[in-house]
């Protein structure tokens, strides 16, 4: 028993390797990501299509999200006021 390690004293790393094969320091804590193709931002065709949909020059009113939310809340408040006024008449 002096030359061999017991089961309790052997540390097993996250990947299932014993502590004698496990990398030490920061290399042991971080795993490398697989290498992707040649450069680029990594956007897919679906993401590019979505960006084109939102950035294309389309006919219609151009409104920011803040304007849309403000108008929606105003409409909800107006309908609520109409219900309250209609209840008391």
Curated annotation (Swiss-Prot):
Residues 1-65 are cytoplasmic. The keyword Transmembrane applies. It comes from the Eukaryota. Residues 1-10 have a biased composition (Polar residues). The chain crosses the membrane at residues 66-86. Pfam families: Sec61_beta (PF03911). Residues 1-46 are annotated as: Disordered. GO terms for biological process: intracellular protein transport; tail-anchored membrane protein insertion into ER membrane. It is a single-pass membrane protein. One of its GO terms (cellular component) is Sec61 translocon complex. Necessary for protein translocation in the endoplasmic reticulum. It comes from Chlamydomonas reinhardtii (Chlamydomonas smithii). Keywords: Endoplasmic reticulum, Membrane, Protein transport, Translocation, Transmembrane, Transmembrane helix, Transport. Heterotrimeric complex composed of SEC61-alpha, SEC61-beta and SEC61-gamma. Interacts with ARSA2. Belongs to the SEC61-beta family. The lineage of its organism: Eukaryota, Viridiplantae, Chlorophyta, core chlorophytes, Chlorophyceae. It is found in: Endoplasmic reticulum membrane. InterPro entries: Sec61-beta/Sbh, SecG/Sec61-beta/Sbh. This is Protein transport protein Sec61 subunit beta.
């Amino acid at each position: 028993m002096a030359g061999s390690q017991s089961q309790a004293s052997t540390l097993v790393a996250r990947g299932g390797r014993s502590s004698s094969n496990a990398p030490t320091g920061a290399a042991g804590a971080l795993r490398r990501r697989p290498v992707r193709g040649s450069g680029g931002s990594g956007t897919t065709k679906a993401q590019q299509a979505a960006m084109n949909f939102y950035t294309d020059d389309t006919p219609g009113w151009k409104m920011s999200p803040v304007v849309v939310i403000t108008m929606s809340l105003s409409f909800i408040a107006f309908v609520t006021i109409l219900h309250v006024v209609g209840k008391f008449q």
